[in-house]
Amino acid sequence: MSLQNSHSKKYVLTFFMSTCLLTSSFLSTSARAASFTQLANQIPTLSGLSEVQRKQKWNSYTLQEKQEAWRRAKLTPDFVQAMIDMQTGFTESDLSSRNNKTRHKAREKKSELDLYIAGTKQGFKEKVDGYISQGKIPTPEEAAQNLEIDYDAKKTDNKLEKNQNVRRVEKDKKALLDLYIHSITTSVKEKEYITTGQVPELGELEKALNISKEEAKHRRTIIRDQVMANERPKLVRSGTVLTKKELHKRFGKDTTTDDTKYIDDITTEVMYTKKQGYVNTDFLPKISEIMNEFKVDKGRANLYLNQIKAGIEAKLLADNNQTTTKPFTKHSRTTTNTAGISSGVPFDTGRTKPETKSFDFKRSMYSLLNRKQEDQLSKTEQHLKQQIKLEENKEEFKEILTKNPIDALLFAEQSNLGNSFKQEAISNIDLSKDISRILFTVDDKGNRTILNTILTTTPEHKDELIKQAQHHAIQTLPTSISDKDVSDKKKLTLATLAATEDKKVLEEALDNWLSTNGYKRKPEVESLISILLSDETTLKAGIDKIFELPVENNVNNNSNKGQNGTPILPPTPPLNGSMPPSPPPPLLNGTPTSTAFNNSNPNHKFDLKNFEATYPRLYKSYNEFIQNTTSASQSQATTTSNNIPDTKAKMGESLELLKQKVAKQNEVIGLIHNEVTKLYNFSPKTFVNLFNTENEEIIKKIEQIAKREDIQKILQDNDIKITSTFVSKIFNESLEQTKQRLRSSNIINAKQYKRIEQYANKQECVTEFLRITNPLEQLKFANKYINILGQSTFNGKLNELIENPNKLTFSQKINFVLQGYQELTREIPTAKANLNKLKQNILEKIEIQQLIANKDISRKDLLDILNNKNPELLKSLLEAKVILEENKLNNSANEVDLKEIIPSLNYLTSEQLTSLINRITIEGVKTALKAKWQQENKTVSNNTEKPLIYNNGTPMPPPIPNGNSNFGTNDYLISMGYTQEFIDRMDKVKPNNNFGKNHNYTATDFKSNVGKNYYESTSKLGGTDILLTDSQKLENAIKKEVLAKYIEEPNRDMQDDSLLKQAFEEKFYYAEDKNTKVIPKPSEVNFDPNFIGPRTEVGQEIYELYEQELLKLARDPVFIEYVKNNNNTQKDERELLISFIEQIESKRPELEQKYGSDVQSEDNNQEKKVGHLNMKQFQSLFQQENESANDESSTKDDPQPEDSNKKSEKSDSETALSPRLLSSNDSKNDKSSDDKKSLLVLRSSEEESKKDIALESEDEAIDMSFKTEAIAEQDEATQRQQVSDDTNRKVAILVKATSTLHKPVHYNILSDRLKVAAIGAGDEEASINRGVWISGLYGINKQGTWKNIPKYQGRTTGVTIGADAEFINSHDVIGIAYSRLEFQIKYNKKLEKTAVNGHLLSIYGLKELIKGFSLQAITSYGHNYIKNKSKSINNIIGKYQNNNLSFQTLLNYKYRTKYDLHFIPNIGFKYDYSRASNYKEYNVDIENLMNQKKSNQSFESSIGGKIVFKPIATVNNIILTPSLYGNIERHFNNKNTKVNAKATFKGQTLQETIIIPKQPKLGYNIGSNILMSKKNINVLLEYNYYTHRKYQSHQGLIKLKVNL
């Protein structure tokens, strides 16, 4: 143990030193590692804040903004600060963890932190941007050079580098390089998508970027939003309004994006653009036209139409505008659209009338009232005068609106018109054209009248105004910035707007301006540069001020604004020591100067270093400009009176004065800090927190101190006033500043300072503790700093987790149980009792379902968790595992009731239980149980000296001293209650761990041909197969065997060679995906057992053969053992093959049910005969792709194997042939004695045992007839087997056929009786309408192979006659019908054909209910019978009768839409009861076959609908009414059925149990019909299609009805 600990310590020390060296390589640049405090002191927005405010502000930054801040400061964060910046946890010890998952996660986190640190260095961003702009991906060598690390890929190979520590360090470097390259690759790919305007599919993005699905969703959303934003102007210009479906087709779907808003915005812009066209042409579109063109609802279309009408009306009023001397009444024309909607303008006569003079009452009254003084008017007269004036203002507003909407808005504001008029004016303003006037029109007081009016009236226009203003600024700034006629305020406003959208526009405009010799002023330039250097918060505050919006509580948001609301930043200090013009120092009382460019902000310094680092090219231009400006100002200082003052020209002197002023302020602030501190009694908490936040109490004390004479004198001498700004600086003291001030003062002594330092350290620890989000990491942190935080913090957190373990995530719970518990108990042995409680509570909260679902948990970890959680459960799992392994070993298909073995897990599904058991191994469970037993044994032996007792009462042997004893290896299992018999069973099924050493396999050990061929290919030491992987060899072995089975059919033509090559070599598809989507071969991706060929007829047959081979593999325990324990296979290949084995084992029950009776065990001791197939032709199908060109030639040269097939048929009679081959031989010639020699193999013991399984359903008796001449010469065992096989097939077919026989009749009786239009009053000649009708039915049916139902084809014919009466007033119907049906079933030629005859009597009715509802019902009684007579020598007579009673009801609702289209949804229910009679059969060989009388019932529900189109009138008064219908059926009470038959066969009694699978749960029905009516004759033509799993039915119907 001590040796192990020493090695562990040595390893940790070595690894820690390696990690330090690696980290230092990243930090070995010109920049030095720094703390956050050093950085914050250099950031203007952080330097004036308290420590808490700094961290809050810093945490609001994005990672890119944080990296930019470090770069500007030319500092590099240390590793701990990087973790704080990224808000991620990282534990150094995880890098040396034995758990691969933990180690890999730690490596990923470390690479992210290292890349973040590298991103803060100078030049890093420029290199990355260079790669992205060029669309280039760096090589690993270039990445290592850029990151300044020394990486050697060879050192990651354990064969070349034996030192594990060196390997892990190199792997850490590789992880960093991979992350660096991946980030650039992602950016390049995103840029490519955005540039081309393509939105990738999610799967494509996952594959292209090699990222997770969640990250791919996020990336795709970013790409999609950007592409949609780029396409928006094009859509608006083209007038294209997209629907959601069109939008999704063009850009794809994304649930996180508000597509409705995007479409609505485009629609609004397009409608606004087209509105003026309607107004100019005096055209009023229809409501329907607006709805169709812009895809809007009726309400919005009405609103849009009203706007057009208002615009036309205003235009007409403007055209007919008259002077005040003309009569008040105006003549105009009115336009009316095709819908009859008037434009609303009066006096439309249709012709021009001569203008006439008329008396204007309003004008005359207003003139009369205007002659009087205001004090002479009565209240009524005053009101009347105001109303007349208001009417005049409205008329004048409309006239102005047609000419200039902005003037109309100002007029409405001045005339006090209502908001409706202002809104109308605003709706007519073209923001893209008039934004300049809106922004820069001010009144005498400097207020933006137009802008304020718009925002006050319609605040919802705010975002659009800001957007248009930014767009306008970007367009006009390059020309405005160099125009001396443009005011300073306007330039600053444009610069602020442009910078918020794209700072590059401002940068390029400044650079071009400084590079020219045109007009420019230094204050103006420096103010614009200050805007360029401003952060987002300052710029946002500037935007809010421009638009007079509420400004957020940003730092210095008031003192940093000019008169026009633009944020003004201080000018830059001189570069060359000269004295260029400089602004005066800031006023302490916060009063701004009068010049917009001369405001200064002491908290926002103009940092030349920052300027140079961020914009080097612009900095160079600015430097040249400063030098030229300085020279010019010095030469002209005495020649003109308009020169800049000397104080401004001497920026250096001014700056020095400013520094002195600030230094004096800081001294005064420190003095006030100390004086206030002296007023309080000593308390570490009080002294530390005194100036971190403002409070009224301290402010009052500051005011008291400021009134003292000594303080007053100091303030006056230094020209300092106590303003709110000055007070805010007093409360900006950080924790470090507080400690430094108190340490250097005489307020406290050394002992008191030590207490303050302890308290401050505790505060920092508490802050860091609260920052940690992982509760377990908090627990470790509290233990690490327990001397500072105290024992109570640790105990409190531990008790909190004990009470509520769900605060931990699932992964955190697992990590604690497996690792965290051991680490904490080792570090904190005193807390072991509470840690045990926490562990037990966590284990109780871990659900078994979670363990099953989480595939990342290793097998060992899973067993450890289960062993800790419930050892008894592990014992039950061991029992189940042994039983399942025994079944596999014995090739048994008996289903095991896992829930009975493990009753404690009966809440799990069978699939979950199987998955859990498959993930464990017997040896793994034994190891876990042994470890648990040894732990308990050690605990007991330490606590007591009493002898240990077994569960059975026998004394337990003493503990094993030092591992050397004769103690039995399995005695611990006996002590746990296992018997020796069970232990022996475990040993039998235990896999061979010495595979390849002590066990020598031979080809004859394998039961399947595929297994034998695979073994031979893997055991070869040479040949062409040496280049293939083991999974490719297994793939080829399966292909060859499937092909051999396919070709062995005697009637198979080898011309199918091209189809087989296509099925095997070119295309592979997954069974779940039935479409034609091509995917790579399984050997290239994963060896999934569900790959199949193309879904053609050949492909389907190949797929069935393929599944049969999978079943044979699942029955071959030697093959499974060989694959699972073959240590010679590479790790990745072995995992791939084991995954394949697990999948076919899980599919085995399904395959047994589907092919159990057909698949035979292959005798590997004899050579299997498949005909003398030419091996060249056989091998040509499996050559590599580069040899595919030779396939056709080799195939064409080989002869067809007809003769060899004949020889094969006459060969050894013991050769096992498939049922398909036998049926083909029998059908070829019934009289051929050679064909009769073919034998059927008895079904396996698994198939026999399946008959004993209890089924849910009731029994059903079915008639059977057998053909005997084909088995006359076979032995009795084979004959019995053939009887069983034929019985299974035919019973399954007949049950399936009779279940759907009456379905088309039921559906078609009332399909045309739902009335969709009311009869007019003049048509009601009789109260009852009687009629007779007749219909003919013809249908074809096809059933594919499904479970144990073989494929067959059928034909249905039938005739139905009926009569009914319809009550005209209520449309109710009642009637009766009789149907005669015949169903011809054709399966293989061996079983001949069967005819099912049926008679059906139905009573039906239809009742109209309220509000469009109707109810229809059909009750039917049917009688079916089967009578077969074969044409062979030995007749078999089989009689069968079946009576059926069914009831079906359907509730309909008729809904009429536009264009006389009727939609009729419906929901229905059906009940069916059937009863079969006893029957017997007689023939030569089967003397007596009897089935008992049985009954069965089923339930079915349906939901669907019908669409009836508008009737069409044709020539000769024939009315055509087409319709479509469809529904979905759901079967209930759906159970398997078994048929028990008892037969006397050649003197022996045979019993046969036939399993009929339950129907699929869902069925689908769709159809269409057309009703032709003329007078009292109706003719209905109908087509119907019905389908469910592997079953299809097509029916055609013609129906004639005559109304009497």
Swiss-Prot record:
Look up the record and report any one GO term of the cellular component aspect: cell outer membrane
> Main subcellular localization, coarse class?
membrane
Q: Where is the composition biased (Pro residues)?
A: 568-587
Domain named Autotransporter: which ranges? 1325-1604
* Locations listed in the record: Cell outer membrane
Tell me if Cell division is a UniProt keyword of this record. no
Q: Matching Gene3D superfamilies, A to Z?
A: Autotransporter beta-domain
Per the record's keyword annotation, is Signal included, yes or no?
yes
Cite the entry's keywords alphabetically: Cell outer membrane, Membrane, Signal, Transmembrane, Transmembrane beta strand
* Signal peptide residue numbers: 1-33
Xref: PROSITE patterns = AUTOTRANSPORTER (PS51208)
Compositional bias per record (Basic and acidic residues), positions renumbered to this chain:
1193-1213, 1227-1240
Superkingdom field: Bacteria
Q: Which InterPro entries match?
A: Autotransporte_beta, Autotransporte_beta_dom_sf, OM_autotransptr_brl_dom, Sca2
* Residue stretches of biased makeup (Low complexity): 554-564
Region Disordered, residue ranges = 324-354, 554-603, 1183-1240
Q: By what name is this protein known?
A: Putative surface cell antigen sca2
